[in-house]
Amino acid sequence: VHWTAEEKQLITGLWGKVNVADCGAEALARLLIVYPWTQRFFASFGNLSSPTAIIGNPMVRAHGKKVLTSFGEAVKNLDNIKNTFAQLSELHCDKLHVDPENFRLLGDILIIVLAAHFTKDFSPDCQAAWQKLVRAVAHALARKYH
């Protein structure tokens, strides 16, 4: 993926404002609520019976933070996203058998969460840069499937 200087600035500038714990928890909770079939990968998380239960679930919150922390590695390694996610791709493909479409869905949800949290900063140019990033991450995570 080729990044312009402006795209890199838009991504890193916004990322510096992100509360990884809060945005990660919200993104994963939204994924589980909006796309309930994704819950099957999180059966060990306990009560996922309602939106309130999901939002209040400490395991969802902790894993959301873990997911977004990992996403931060993409921000730090924009020029090497494929290698950054090689091990996670293998884990999600070989051991967890996650449908790679779910990576795209989570990326789209992350865009919504960022837009909701950073309305003033989330210009169309910023959205385009982030959309490019979430697609690159989803592609890197799905790489082991091909």
Curated annotation (Swiss-Prot):
Keywords: Heme, Iron, Metal-binding, Oxygen transport, Transport
The keyword Nucleus is annotated on this UniProt entry: no
Coiled-coil annotated spans: none
Positions contributing to heme b binding: H63, H92
GO BP: any one term: hydrogen peroxide catabolic process
Subunit structure: Heterotetramer of two alpha chains and two beta chains.
PANTHER family, A to Z: HEMOGLOBIN FAMILY MEMBER (PTHR11442), HEMOGLOBIN SUBUNIT EPSILON (PTHR11442:SF7)
Family, per entry: Belongs to the globin family.
Name of the protein described by the UniProt record: Hemoglobin subunit beta
Underlying gene: HBB
